C-alpha cells in the first residue's frame, strides 16, 4: 500500500513538473478563483501574491468600504520597501494603456491611503524609495500630496 501511494505521489509530481514546463500550470493559476477574501487570507498568512492576484487587485471594483482598510494595510505592508512586490504590480499594470494603468496604481494608492498618511513621509521622494512602482506614474505625486492633506 505504501509503495502504491509513493508511486502515485511521484507520478503526480512528474505530471505537475511536466505541466509547469508546458505552460499549463500557469493556465491553471489564471483560472483559479481569486477574491478579495483569498487576497486578504494570503496577505494575512504572509503568502506572496502572484501577478494574477495583482491584476485582480488593479481591476476588481467590488471591494466594499468595510474591507478596504484591512486590505489596504496588508497591501501597504506587502509593498512598502519590497522592490520585488512592486515589480509584480508594475508587470500587471502593463496589461492596460498607460493612462488607465496609471489610474489603477492611483486607485491602489488610495486603498493604502491611511497607512501612507500614518507612515509620515517627509516628501514624495521618500515615498518613492518604498514604492518605486509609482516613479513613472502620472498623477501619483499629486495624489500622494492629496492623501497627506486630507489626513
Q: How should each PLM-predicted stretch be described?
A:
Residues 4-5, 23:
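Residue-level detector of intrinsically disordered/flexible regions characterized by low predicted structural confidence
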Residues 16-19:
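C-terminal motif of bacterial Sec signal peptides marking the signal peptidase cleavage site
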Residues 24-151:
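Non-catalytic all-alpha helical scaffold/repeat segments
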Residues 5-14:
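Sec-dependent N-terminal signal peptides
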Amino acid at each position: 500500500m505504501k509503495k502504491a501511494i509513493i508511486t502515485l505521489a511521484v507520478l503526480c509530481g512528474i505530471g505537475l513538473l511536466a505541466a509547469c514546463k508546458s505552460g499549463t500550470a500557469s493556465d491553471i493559476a489564471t483560472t483559479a478563483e481569486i477574491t478579495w477574501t483569498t487576497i486578504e487570507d494570503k496577505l494575512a498568512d504572509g503568502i506572496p501574491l502572484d501577478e494574477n492576484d495583482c491584476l485582480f487587485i488593479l481591476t476588481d471594483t467590488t471591494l466594499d468600504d468595510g474591507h478596504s482598510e484591512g486590505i489596504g494595510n496588508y497591501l501597504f505592508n506587502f509593498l512598502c520597501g519590497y522592490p520585488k512586490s512592486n515589480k509584480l504590480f508594475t508587470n500587471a499594470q502593463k496589461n492596460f494603456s498607460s493612462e488607465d494603468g496609471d489610474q489603477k496604481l492611483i486607485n491602489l494608492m488610495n486603498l493604502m491611503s491611511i497607512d501612507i498618511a500614518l507612515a509620515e513621509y517627509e516628501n514624495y521622494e521618500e515615498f518613492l524609495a518604498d514604492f518605486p512602482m509609482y516613479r513613472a506614474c502620472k498623477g501619483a505625486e499629486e495624489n500622494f500630496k492629496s492623501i497627506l492633506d486630507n489626513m
